[in-house]
């Protein structure tokens, strides 16, 4: 695999920081009882008031802690498994590594932009930056010209394309409906405590 020199230190750094960030999100001490407030747009929201995500809403905190759990139980083991195999030349591991880095990039880009400011903000930014450049290096190491010859003729290309297209269509319908509803009904957008739709922007722009 190309760019091994950089990836050999970048990926362990990502794993260490992601393990710390995810564990902190799940086990950070302190907090009180959730409380209600009204946002600047007149929307009633419930603030979590516990742990690392104390300043986020109950709904947002639950979603972020679910991401933390996925990171600890799935993403980090996959990085640990795929990295040495990819370095030894396994194409499957290389593609798995790229996909897992994409997950880390998406997760910590959204955390850096959407999570209420907390003690780990700099960690989120570091993970966003490291995973972005690691993903770029990982993708640059793929022999794109020789890639078709590495796949079986029996690969279900249409099924894969349908799955990807269906996922994109589902997200588009779901998020565009949420975006246009306030225009049509004259109601406040469902932003909770935020000022804009960060996840919707990422999903519609990237996914």
Which positions does each model-derived feature cover?
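Membrane-helix boundary elements
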Residues: 41-58, 170-200
């Amino acid at each position: 695999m190309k760019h091994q020199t950089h990836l050999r230190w970048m990926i362990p750094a990502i794993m260490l920081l992601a393990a710390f960030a995810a564990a902190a999100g799940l086990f950070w001490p302190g907090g009180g009882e959730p409380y209600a407030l009204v946002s600047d747009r007149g929307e009633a929201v419930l603030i979590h008031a516990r742990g690392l995500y104390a300043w986020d809403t109950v709904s947002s905190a639950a979603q972020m802690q679910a991401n933390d759990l996925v990171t600890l139980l799935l993403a980090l083991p996959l990085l640990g498994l795929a990295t040495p195999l990819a370095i030894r030349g396994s194409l499957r591991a290389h593609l798995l590594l790229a996909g897992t880095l994409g997950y880390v990039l998406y997760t910590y880009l959204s955390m850096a932009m959407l999570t209420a400011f907390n003690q780990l903000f700099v960690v989120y930014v570091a993970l966003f930056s490291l995973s972005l450049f690691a993903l770029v290096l990982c993708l640059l190491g793929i022999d794109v010209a020789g890639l078709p010859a590495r796949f079986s003729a029996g690969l279900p290309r249409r099924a894969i394309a349908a799955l990807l297209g269906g996922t994109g269509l589902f997200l588009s319908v779901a998020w565009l409906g949420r975006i246009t509803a306030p225009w049509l009904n004259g109601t406040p957008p469902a932003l909770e405590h935020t000022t804009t739709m960060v996840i919707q922007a990422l999903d519609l722009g990237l996914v």
